[in-house]
């Protein structure tokens, strides 16, 4: 249970921007406020079921691919030194419900995929959210292949083509 709480806490700031936006800042509980406010906020942003067996099993295919091909973000844990029980433990490899030792990370997979998309991908439309932290890894595309990349202003991980400005 303590590992689930620690990992959910580390996920909180990333998930806040992945699925929310700056308007959600007002909902952040004040320092020194009641613990229930923090629990409610975490439930709203991350979900209290985030580290449940059901969620871990549901996301296992993604976590496996993140651990072996996609990579993942690293949480900033410097401010938590001395209070964590699992420092640097929040990693996709720790979330997969089986031994990951036989499956190393291959850092070449995604650059190869992106290279193919840019060189050969035709009629591809990529829509990213301006505020989605995953957009820092946005693929490049080539207009000569009739492919385009757009960032939805103020958008998050749920950005979609209909929400793009009319000019795009």
Model-derived segments and their meaning:
Residues 58-60, 117-120, 141-144:
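Extracellular/periplasmic catalytic domains that process cell-envelope and extracellular macromolecules
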Residues 153-168:
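Catalytic active-site module of serine/aspartate enzymes centered on a nucleophile-bearing elbow/loop
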Residues 126, 149-151:
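Conserved beta-strand scaffold positions in the cores of enzyme catalytic domains, especially
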Residues 120, 126-128:
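Short beta-strand/loop motif that positions the catalytic acidic residue
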Residues 1-108:
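Alpha/beta-hydrolase fold active-site neighborhood
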Residues 77-78, 128, 133-138:
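Conserved alpha/beta-hydrolase "acid-adjacent" motif
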Residues 138-140, 163-164:
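Short coil/turn segments at secondary-structure boundaries
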Residues 108-119:
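The feature captures the conserved acid-bearing segment of alpha/beta-hydrolase catalytic domains
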């Amino acid at each position: 249970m303590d590992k689930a709480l620690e990992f959910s806490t580390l996920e909180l700031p990333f998930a806040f921007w992945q699925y929310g936006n700056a308007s959600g800042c007002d909902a952040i509980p004040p320092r020194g406020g009641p613990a229930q406010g923090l629990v409610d906020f975490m439930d709203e942003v991350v979900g209290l079921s985030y580290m449940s067996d059901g969620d871990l099993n549901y996301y296992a295919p993604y976590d496996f691919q993140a651990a072996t091909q996609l990579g993942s973000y690293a949480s900033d844990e410097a401010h938590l030194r001395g209070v964590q029980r699992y420092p640097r433990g929040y990693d996709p490899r720790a979330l997969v419900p089986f031994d990951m030792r036989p499956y190393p990370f291959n850092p070449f997979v995604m650059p190869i995929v992106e290279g193919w998309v840019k060189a050969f991908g035709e009629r591809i439309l990529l829509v990213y959210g301006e505020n989605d932290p995953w957009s820092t890894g946005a693929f490049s595309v080539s207009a000569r292949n009739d492919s385009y990349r757009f960032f939805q202003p103020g958008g998050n991980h749920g950005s979609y083509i209909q929400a793009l400005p009319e000019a795009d």
